Amino acid sequence: MAIYKTKNTLKKMNLDYSFRTNSTLVSNSEMFSLLYADTTLQKYYKNIVCQDLCLKQDYKNIMECVSLNKIVCNTSSKHYAGEKESILPAFTALEMITGQKPKYTCAKKSISTFKLRQNQILGCKNSLRGNTMYRFLEKYISIVSTRIKDWSENYSSSNKSNSLTTAYNKDYVVLNSNLFPELQQHDELFQNVTGIEISFSTLSNNVKTSTKTSRYKKDGILLYSAFQMPK
């Protein structure tokens, strides 16, 4: 049973629901504690990765360590601009993969050469942060990346750093959407989903590191290697 109401909403409505998980009765407060609890990958980052980065990069405290800021899942195609109904499979696919409702991406201005009008829908995207981000990362590392056999056909990646935003991004393009377990059982519904771009962005709280792009790039590489992400 999916839960879409927040804790404050339930308090206002004076509702006290109980759910069964693995044949045991779980109260409302316990269910919310399970939903917002730190994931295994979060505990691994706080207890092991941060201490390892402090030793390697000579940080004064753990708060200066580079961290994963957000994960952006994006999909777009020229077919979405012509037919509005064709974007529904991609919209549903992103919602099933991330567990979060995506937003539509629209054209910023009209371009007559490409037959585009302003505010015309081009695709959809999702920005993940916090526990949702780590849950998606854990699924991506342990399930999706291990299913890729031919990397040249189903997968492509690129690395880029931005000195203005002090962000070191790592981009992946999963060309085969059936690699995700949520979409594997519904192959016939998501055949038009050509590819899903996944962008990982890091953030540093260290002022010295943020002014030096080369060192920040090294911190980002150390963080990605600690998560054992594919190159």
Swiss-Prot record:
GO terms for molecular function: structural constituent of ribosome. It comes from the Eukaryota. One of its GO terms (biological process) is translation. It is found in: Mitochondrion. Belongs to the universal ribosomal protein uL5 family. PANTHER family: 60S RIBOSOMAL PROTEIN L11-RELATED. This is Large ribosomal subunit protein uL5m. The lineage of its organism: Eukaryota, Viridiplantae, Chlorophyta, core chlorophytes, Trebouxiophyceae.
